[in-house]
Amino acid sequence: MSYFEHIPAIRYEGPQSDNPLAYHHYDAEKRVLGKTMAEHLRIAVCYWHTFVWPGHDIFGQGAFQRPWQQPGDALERARLKADAAFEFFTKLGTPFYTFHDTDVAPEGDSLREYAANFARMVDYLGERQQASGVRLLWGTANLFSHPRFAAGAATNPNPDVFAWAATQVCHALDATHRLGGENYVLWGGREGYETLLNTDLKRERDQFARFLSMVVEHKHRIGFKGALLIEPKPQEPTKHQYDYDVATVHGFLVQYGLQNEIRVNIEANHATLAGHSFHHEIANAFALGVFGSVDANRGDPQNGWDTDQFPNSVEELTLAFYEILRHGGFTTGGMNFDAKVRRQSVDPEDLFYGHVGAIDVLALALERAAVLVENDRLDALRRQRYAQWDDAFGQKILSGGYTLQSLADDALARGVDPRHASGAQERLENIVNQAIYGLR
């Protein structure tokens, strides 16, 4: 008997259905702005929270009793986990999945064992992908869980740790390429510091940049055509991480000449931990030319840590999708659910409830964002606000037609006396509410 045998495939039944194991708003084939919902959303399920996390927290042991988490042969349990995962993906009807290397294969007791185990499981995942049609959105390497990475991976003071991390990324990037992955993600969970008293900031930044340059070189050497993505996060597990937010990552990439090689994977909960909105980080990524993909989840505003809950705010996601749609949508990226059920949600059905509800929220937000984009009054008002910069005077300033002195002389000669114009924030917020709630 399979783990999810008693659960039927999830189908679209419409908003009037009261079936908790059905989609009420997500109709994969429904067309929105010329593409299907499935094509717009590019939904992925993550391996780590869904099949690896045992339901523990810092105060208690694992609450889940998944068959693949029981004692036994490590590779056999990994295959059992993969079987359950692909059954889940197939029944949910999601086109993509994501993984860390050590999510899918046992790490073993040495680097050689790691490589051998991972190679076997990559073969098995390839078979499961071919049988199911489910594809890999992105792969990555876990460079944060093992104690060897306590002081970082690329930024570690020990070059042997750097070498171990490089080996994992080499194998994980090769595996992602072989499995047809469309992106490769680099999350520096331990690339930061606990105290400045023992930290050489310049050295660690240089090490991190060297590591990334090696990844870029390897990508091109093996012919991987997907995108390389850094996932920003300000802290946790370290006190301060070097990939703090989108702007910080972009500045780092520019400093080391990597801005044309690496983009960002934006997680909603990481944005809020950095003191930003999800909307801000996505808009900033597009403004800086580094938008890649999204981890869809949410945090708890009463908690100061990464709770990784399923997204449930149509309002928040509507603005996120508005930015994505008006910039042309995803290319290699997608909406990956970096989210987990709560520790008390121990039934197999709970995994479906979490994903089904979140996918419906994505669908609602996509449709509301499409309303904003179709008759883009927000953009019209935004362009009107900056219209004077498109006139001859504004263009002369931007094109270098003035020096600071000549501009000051011109302003004095003309007696410049600008008047303050309304930002119309309340009107703009009403437009958003009209799109979301159908208000008139």
Curated annotation (Swiss-Prot):
Provide the top EC class: isomerase
* One annotated Gene Ontology cellular component of this protein: cytoplasm
* Chain residues that bind Mg(2+) 1: E231, E267, D295, D338
- Catalytic activity, EC: 5.3.1.5
Q: Where is Mg(2+) 2 annotated to bind?
A: E267, H270, D306, D308
Q: Where in the cell is it found?
A: Cytoplasm
An example GO BP is: D-xylose metabolic process
What catalytic reaction does the record list?
Answer: alpha-D-xylose = alpha-D-xylulofuranose
Cofactor (UniProt): Mg(2+)
Give the cofactor note text.
Binds 2 magnesium ions per subunit.
Keywords in UniProt for this one?
Carbohydrate metabolism, Cytoplasm, Isomerase, Magnesium, Metal-binding, Xylose metabolism
A single GO molecular function term of this UniProt record? xylose isomerase activity
Q: Which residues form the signal peptide?
A: none
The answer, when asked if Magnesium is one of the entry's keywords, is yes
Please, which domain of life does this record's source organism belong to?
Bacteria
Residues forming the catalytic site: H100, D103
Family listed:
Belongs to the xylose isomerase family.
PANTHER family tied to this protein:
PTHR48408, XYLOSE ISOMERASE (PTHR48408:SF1)
Q: How does it assemble?
A: Homotetramer.
Q: What is this protein called?
A: Xylose isomerase
- Organism, per UniProt? Burkholderia ambifaria (strain ATCC BAA-244 / DSM 16087 / CCUG 44356 / LMG 19182 / AMMD) (Burkholderia cepacia (strain AMMD))
Q: Which gene name belongs to this protein?
A: xylA
